[in-house]
Amino acid sequence: MLENKKPATKEIAKHIDSCLSCYSCMTTCPSGVNYMHLIDHGRNYVEETYKRPFLDRVFRNILSFVLPRPKVFLLMALSSKLIKPFSFLFPKFIRNALNLMPDKIPGKKLKDQKVYEVNKGKKVSRVALLTGCVQRVISPEINEATIRLLNRHNVEVVVMPDINCCGSLNHHLGKQKLAHESFKNNIESWHEEYLKNGLDAIISNTSGCGTTLKDYGHIFKNDKDLKKKAQKISELTKDITEYLDENLKLNINLNSEKKYRIAYHSACSMQHGQKVHDQPKD
């Protein structure tokens, strides 16, 4: 498709859409082909050259508009509880989307503030946290726990009020223009904070988002205005497990009488996208 510069077909769109971006192909490929960038390019090309069925276009546009906006997504999630009893009246794709909505939306949420200061002692580091879009609504306790843990270890946490989505959702939908708008906004906002007040890292606690942030430098490698800024943001980005292991060197008492048994999910985008394998298992 790309070599012949022909419009994408229904069959090609089906295969491209089926890719989950787990990136295991990048790990297993003996030649080291970067399929992540190939599939991203393919998605953009499909979006530009293939006319999808009407309902498909409607659904993708709904996802593109709603999910990156936490307030809109929260409203939709709350509304879904009222709509579910009447889901049989809607097309299949709407019914499927309604079934994915949680029955209960968590009441916890981050305070409306930009800086979360350390609890006690001297500040040892200052980081920005990507709180995300969908996660902020569905699982806000993840961000809350991340901030508590970092504050407890004397790390000041900054949450930029103008940053919601990392941009990967529209990026994976092939909506390049919308994705790049998010990318540019995030880069400019974080870079300004980095220059004015200093940032030692940009923390991601969602592996898919972190993979995209670390790719900003590549995405804007040919943009003379954003190239250096994007590269700096990618360099600063660390998954929370990386930061805890490499920067804080947590002193965990393994000889404590109280024993803990936990399960850890080593996400595919973490292993294959970010090449983070050992933290926090070692």
Per-region residue spans from a language model:
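Iron-sulfur cluster-binding cysteine motifs and their immediate structural context
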Residues: 1, 13, 20-45, 212
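Short, charged low-complexity linear segments at domain edges
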Residues: 1-10, 123, 140-141
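Short, intrinsically disordered, charge-biased short linear motifs at domain edges
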Residues: 6-16, 151-153
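Iron-sulfur cluster-binding electron-transfer modules in prokaryotic oxidoreductases
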Residues: 35-282
